């Protein structure tokens, strides 16, 4: 006798039912909880994949209101450095600015500029006393690189400084009066406490929806594995200032993953931890009991994932989301829908099934900010995109996600493929279209907030003919829409 538990559904099996509405799409509130302590301004996360999320994409997504998760297919130092770059990209106050010594040569300063990507540094002596500041303008036309920072810096007597509690108007007034773009934050004894830049204020005004921490810095997440040896990686990421840690595995309902969550929670009781992936209520409860702040759902729905075909295991995504959300609804632990999102309507369906936000890979792969070079094939531009269970990704470090870290390279059993995806342009345009579709859904269903969509919206099950009718049919597309591409 077959032990069939129940029937399970995915995105193309259902549609949301329109309802009476007083909600206009442009008034819908897209903010949602990632964890109890982290609120997103849009319900979107980027996947921790080596062809999706590194520094550039994490910065761009945070500026739009979401969070990117830096992948782990790199050294500990490199991953921590990428987290630091996101945290330093935009700040209300840079609380720990990179400083230089007055005796540093301009040649060494030039290397520091190349490494960090910016050219302004407070200058401190051996006792950490603030003695000046040096900027790119100070050294722009200098040819003798053997000279030192002290020869060209703005000295202490001419520094523009404020105390930590200075108002925005006071800071802007000083910048205008002295025609400077950097103001240093100092203590009563003139110790350096931070730096404020005009560029950061301008970025804040241009991106008011940005997802930021309490210090005005962009938020960023990072992924780690569950296997032995990840303790050092976790410590380095926490030290780098990561906002949320992702303990990532293809099977989150396994003892090794649960133990990693328990150990991390014991060591860092206040650290937001996302754990996954699971596809059942039991798996979600186990991760929550272990100490997860949010649970990631999805086994095999991704476009580049072959887990369900290779192993025969998985649960269609709508049912998996609904089961996990129902199991955790009284605990206040959010569910993240990871995988299978092709259209903005799928985002709406995932949230209506109970997810607080979605994690996407293929939707963001191929953007300007995604890692990798643009490749031309038959006259069209592409970027590479591969699953973390592909042979290429596993050989670079993701094999532990699939419990194969002890396998030799020629003995790996892949659960994903390597491919290419059309070049899509800038991330902000993709997000605009996807969130526009979500807003329209909220207007059609009468849901003013993400929480209302999660709890009020109703589904109907549809047939194969229903999904065929839903797509474009009986016509040849002559001009592609930015939010609708088949294949």
Swiss-Prot record:
SUPFAM superfamilies: CBS-domain pair, Inosine monophosphate dehydrogenase (IMPDH)
Binding site for IMP: 303, 338-340, 361-362, 385-389, 415
Pathway: Purine metabolism; XMP biosynthesis via de novo pathway; XMP from IMP: step 1/1
GO biological process: GMP biosynthetic process; GTP biosynthetic process
Enzyme class: oxidoreductase
Regulation: Mycophenolic acid (MPA) is a non-competitive inhibitor that prevents formation of the closed enzyme conformation by binding to the same site as the amobile flap. In contrast, mizoribine monophosphate (MZP) is a competitive inhibitor that induces the closed conformation. MPA is a potent inhibitor of mammalian IMPDHs but a poor inhibitor of the bacterial enzymes. MZP is a more potent inhibitor of bacterial IMPDH.
An example molecular function term from Gene Ontology annotations: nucleotide binding
InterPro entries registered for this protein in UniProt: Aldolase_TIM, CBS_dom, CBS_dom_sf, IMP_DH, IMP_DH/GMP_Rdtase_CS, IMP_DH_GMPRt
Signal sequence segment: none
Cofactor(s) in the UniProt record: K(+)
Protein's UniProt keywords contain Membrane: no
Residues the record marks as active site: 305, 401
Matches recorded under PROSITE patterns: CBS, IMP_DH_GMP_RED
Residues given in the record as K(+) binding sites: 300, 302, 305, 469-471
Residues covered by the CBS domain: 93-149, 153-214
Top-level taxon of origin: Bacteria
Keyword vocabulary terms for this entry: CBS domain, GMP biosynthesis, Metal-binding, NAD, Oxidoreductase, Potassium, Purine biosynthesis, Repeat
Enzymatic reactions: IMP + NAD(+) + H2O = XMP + NADH + H(+)
Positions that bind NAD(+): 248-250, 298-300
EC number(s) reported in the record: 1.1.1.205
Role noted for this protein: Catalyzes the conversion of inosine 5'-phosphate (IMP) to xanthosine 5'-phosphate (XMP), the first committed and rate-limiting step in the de novo synthesis of guanine nucleotides, and therefore plays an important role in the regulation of cell growth.
Assembly: Homotetramer.
Family: Belongs to the IMPDH/GMPR family.
Protein name per Swiss-Prot or TrEMBL: Inosine-5'-monophosphate dehydrogenase
Organism: Pasteurella multocida (strain Pm70)
Gene coding for it: guaB
């Amino acid at each position: 006798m077959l032990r069939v538990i129940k029937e399970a559904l995915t995105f193309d099996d259902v549609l949301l039912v329109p309802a009476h509405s007083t909600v206009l799409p442009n008034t819908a509130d897209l903010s949602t909880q990632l964890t109890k302590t982290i609120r997103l301004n849009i319900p979107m996360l980027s996947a921790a994949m080596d062809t999706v999320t590194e520094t550039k994409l994490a910065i761009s997504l945070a500026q739009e209101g979401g969070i990117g998760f830096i992948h782990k297919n790199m050294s500990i130092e490199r991953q921590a450095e990428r987290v630091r770059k996101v945290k330093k990209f935009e700040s209300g106050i840079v609380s720990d600015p990179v400083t230089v010594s007055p005796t540093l040569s301009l040649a060494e300063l030039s290397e520091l500029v190349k490494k960090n990507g910016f050219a302004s540094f407070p200058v401190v002596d051996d006792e950490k006393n603030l003695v000046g500041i040096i900027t790119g303008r100070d050294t722009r036309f200098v040819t003798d690189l053997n000279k030192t920072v002290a020869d060209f810096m703005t000295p202490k007597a001419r520094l523009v400084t404020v105390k930590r509690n200075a108002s925005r108007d006071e800071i802007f007034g000083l910048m205008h009066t002295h025609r400077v773009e950097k103001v240093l934050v100092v203590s009563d004894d003139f110790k350096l406490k931070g730096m404020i830049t005009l560029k950061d204020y301008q970025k804040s005004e241009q991106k008011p929806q940005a997802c930021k921490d309490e210090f005005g810095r962009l938020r960023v997440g990072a992924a780690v594995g569950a296997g032995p040896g990840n303790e050092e990686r976790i410590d380095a990421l926490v030290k780098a200032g990561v906002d949320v840690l992702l303990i990532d595995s293809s099977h989150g309902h396994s003892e090794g993953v649960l133990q990693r969550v328990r150990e991390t929670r014991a060591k860092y009781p206040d650290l937001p931890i996302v754990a996954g992936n699971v596809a059942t209520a039991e798996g979600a409860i186990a991760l929550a009991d272990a100490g997860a702040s949010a649970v990631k759902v999805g086994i095999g729905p991704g476009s580049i994932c072959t887990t369900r075909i290779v192993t025969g295991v998985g649960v269609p995504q709508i049912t998996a989301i609904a089961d996990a959300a129902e199991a955790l609804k009284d605990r206040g632990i959010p569910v993240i829908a990871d995988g299978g999102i092709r259209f903005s309507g799928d985002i709406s369906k995932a949230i209506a099934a109970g997810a607080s936000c979605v994690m996407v890979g293929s939707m963001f792969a191929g953007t300007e900010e995604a890692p990798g070079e643009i490749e031309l094939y038959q006259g069209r531009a592409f970027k590479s995109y591969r699953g973390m269970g592909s042979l290429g990704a596993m050989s670079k470090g993701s094999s532990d996600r699939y419990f194969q870290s002890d396998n030799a390279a020629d003995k790996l059993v892949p659960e994903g493929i390597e491919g290419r995806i059309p070049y899509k342009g800038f991330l902000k345009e993709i997000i605009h279209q996807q969130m526009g579709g979500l807003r329209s859904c909220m207007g059609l269903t009468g849901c003013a907030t993400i929480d209302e969509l999660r709890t009020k919206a109703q589904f109907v099950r549809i047939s194969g003919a229903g999904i065929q009718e839903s797509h474009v049919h009986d016509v040849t597309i002559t001009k592609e829409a930015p939010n609708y591409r088949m294949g």
